[in-house]
C-alpha cells in the first residue's frame, strides 16, 4: 500500500490489534436533532446534543477501536473518549441543500484538514452524496472537490476516509424497490471511481451494495435479489477497490446489520470493519430525553454495550485486516 508511514500509523490508531476498524459513528447532527425532536416539543439545545455525545463516548468507546465525531457538537465527547480509542473528525456540513439539484458537497467553513489534525484527529472523514448517473456538470464538481480534500490530507499527512452515499434524483425513496434495483451498480461504480489514485482516499466508508430488506431469505415482502445475486453484488463490490473499505450501518437495526456482515463475509467480501452509528446507540436518544442522563447511561451500559459487544464478536468472525489490501 503506497501510504506514508505516518498515515499507516494513524490508521493503526483507528483499528484494533487484528487490523480491523471497529469504529463508533456519532457525527450525526441534523439526523440526531430530528431524532431528539420526536421526543420533545422544544428545539434540542447545543448543551443537550453535546452531553448525549459525551455520554456515548464515556460509556462505549472502551469497546470501540475509534470514534467518529463532528467538530460542531462532538469536541467535548472527543475529550471524554477512552485513551486507547482513536478519533476521526467529520469535515462536511451536515445534510445538503434540498432546493438545489445535485447534492453538492460543502466543508465546514471554520475547519481545514490542518485544524482537524490539530484538534487531535487521527483521520479526516468526508461525506459525499454521489450518483454515477448524474449529469457530468454535477459530477465533475464533486470529483474536483474530493481531489482538493485528498490533496489537503496528503499535505497534512493525515488519512482521508471518504464516505459515499448513493442516490438517484429520479427515485425519491432510496428504501424503495426501484432504488434497490439500481443500488448495486451505483454503490460499486462510485467505489471504483474514488479508488483512483488522483483522489488520495485512504479508506472508503460505504453502503452495502444491496438493500437487505429485498434479499431472498431476508425479505418480508417483494424480493429484488436472490441470495446468489446479492452475494455476487458483494463480490463485485470487493473487486471494485484495492483500498481498505468499511461498512456504514445506514440506520438499520443492530440485528440486521450483524446479519448483513455475516452475509457479506459468506459472499466473499473482504471488508475491513465498520463505522456503526445508530444501530448501536439510537435507543439511548428517547431514554435520554424522557428519563434523563442516568437512565441513558444505564441504557448504554446494558443495551448499548450488548449492541457493540455483539457487533465486535461478528466482526471478529467476518472482517479482515486492512493491511491485507494492496
UniProtKB/Swiss-Prot annotation:
GO terms for biological process: 6-sulfoquinovose(1-) catabolic process; D-tagatose 6-phosphate catabolic process; lactose catabolic process via tagatose-6-phosphate. It catalyses: D-tagatofuranose 1,6-bisphosphate = D-glyceraldehyde 3-phosphate + dihydroxyacetone phosphate. Pathway: Carbohydrate metabolism; D-tagatose 6-phosphate degradation; D-glyceraldehyde 3-phosphate and glycerone phosphate from D-tagatose 6-phosphate: step 2/2. Keywords: Lactose metabolism, Lyase. Its EC number is 4.1.2.40. It comes from the Bacteria. Transmembrane segments: none annotated. GO terms for molecular function: 6-deoxy-6-sulfofructose-1-phosphate aldolase activity; tagatose-6-phosphate kinase activity; tagatose-bisphosphate aldolase activity. The keyword rRNA-binding does not apply. It is an enzyme of class 4 (lyase). Belongs to the aldolase LacD family. NCBIfam families: lacD (TIGR01232), PRK04161.1 (NF003180), PRK12399.1 (NF009065), PRK12858.1 (NF009498). This is Tagatose 1,6-diphosphate aldolase. It comes from Staphylococcus aureus (strain MW2).
Amino acid at each position: 500500500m503506497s501510504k506514508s508511514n505516518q498515515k499507516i500509523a494513524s490508521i493503526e490508531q483507528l483499528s484494533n490489534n487484528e487490523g480491523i476498524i471497529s469504529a463508533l459513528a456519532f457525527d450525526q447532527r441534523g439526523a440526531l436533532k430530528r431524532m431528539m425532536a420526536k421526543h420533545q416539543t422544544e428545539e434540542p439545545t447545543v448543551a443537550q446534543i453535546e452531553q448525549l455525545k459525551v455520554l456515548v463516548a464515556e460509556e462505549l468507546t472502551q469497546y470501540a477501536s475509534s470514534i467518529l465525531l463532528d467538530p460542531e457538537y462532538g469536541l467535548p465527547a472527543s475529550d471524554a473518549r477512552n485513551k486507547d480509542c482513536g478519533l476521526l473528525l467529520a469535515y462536511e456540513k451536515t445534510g445538503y441543500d434540498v432546493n438545489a439539484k445535485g447534492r453538492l458537497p460543502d466543508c465546514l467553513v471554520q475547519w481545514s484538514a490542518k485544524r482537524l489534525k490539530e484538534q487531535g484527529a487521527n483521520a479526516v472523514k468526508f461525506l459525499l452524496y454521489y450518483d454515477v448517473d448524474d449529469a457530468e456538470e454535477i459530477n465533475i464538481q464533486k470529483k474536483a472537490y474530493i481531489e482538493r480534500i485528498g490533496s489537503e490530507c496528503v499535505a497534512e499527512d493525515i488519512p482521508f476516509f471518504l464516505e459515499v452515499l448513493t442516490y438517484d434524483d429520479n427515485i425519491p425513496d432510496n428504501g424503495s424497490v426501484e432504488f434497490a434495483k439500481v443500488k448495486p451498480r451505483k454503490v460499486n461504480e462510485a467505489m471504483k471511481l474514488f479508488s483512483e489514485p488522483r483522489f488520495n482516499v485512504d479508506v472508503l466508508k460505504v453502503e452495502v451494495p444491496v438493500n437487505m430488506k429485498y434479499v431472498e431469505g431476508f425479505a418480508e415482502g417483494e424480493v429484488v435479489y436472490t441470495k446468489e445475486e446479492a452475494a455476487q453484488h458483494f463480490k463485485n463490490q470487493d473487486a471494485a477497490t484495492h483500498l481498505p473499505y468499511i461498512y456504514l450501518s445506514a440506520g438499520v437495526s443492530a440485528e440486521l446489520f450483524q446479519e448483513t456482515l455475516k452475509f457479506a463475509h459468506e459472499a466473499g467480501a473482504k471488508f475491513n470493519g465498520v463505522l456503526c452509528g445508530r444501530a448501536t446507540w439510537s435507543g439511548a436518544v428517547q431514554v435520554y430525553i424522557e428519563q434523563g442522563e442516568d437512565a441513558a447511561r444505564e441504557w448504554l451500559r446494558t443495551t448499548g454495550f450488548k449492541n457493540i459487544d455483539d457487533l465486535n464478536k461478528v466482526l471478529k468472525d467476518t472482517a479482515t485486516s486492512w493491511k491485507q489490501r494492496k
